[in-house]
Amino acid sequence: MSITPERKAQLIKEFAGKDGDTGSPEVQVAILTERIVNLTEHFRGHAKDNHSRRGLLKMVSQRRSLLDYVKKKDQARYEKLISRLGIRR
């Protein structure tokens, strides 16, 4: 269910603006999206896992807040991010 450190490092490298950039909204959204996708796959086999579902909803909400922030600050950056991640809006 969680992402491997290698995959996390790959996402950071792919979405970071510069070296060592782990806290930018783009990186945070990319990591959250990966975790959300993994949890969604988990629910295909464990439909009644309500404790994990709550965590999923919290992650989706946090991602939504970060995306709203990016959209408010820079519309072009927001559109580029959602197209790269394949998030529909």
Curated annotation (Swiss-Prot):
InterPro entries: Ribosomal_uS15, Ribosomal_uS15_bac-type, uS15_NS1_RNA-bd_sf. GO terms for biological process: translation. Pfam families: Ribosomal_S15. GO terms for molecular function: rRNA binding; structural constituent of ribosome. It comes from the Bacteria. Gene3D superfamilies: 6.10.250.3130, S15/NS1, RNA-binding. Keywords: Ribonucleoprotein, Ribosomal protein, RNA-binding, rRNA-binding. GO terms for cellular component: cytosolic small ribosomal subunit. The keyword RNA-binding applies. Part of the 30S ribosomal subunit. Forms a bridge to the 50S subunit in the 70S ribosome, contacting the 23S rRNA. One of the primary rRNA binding proteins, it binds directly to 16S rRNA where it helps nucleate assembly of the platform of the 30S subunit by binding and bridging several RNA helices of the 16S rRNA. HAMAP family: Ribosomal_uS15_B. Belongs to the universal ribosomal protein uS15 family. This is Small ribosomal subunit protein uS15. The gene is rpsO.
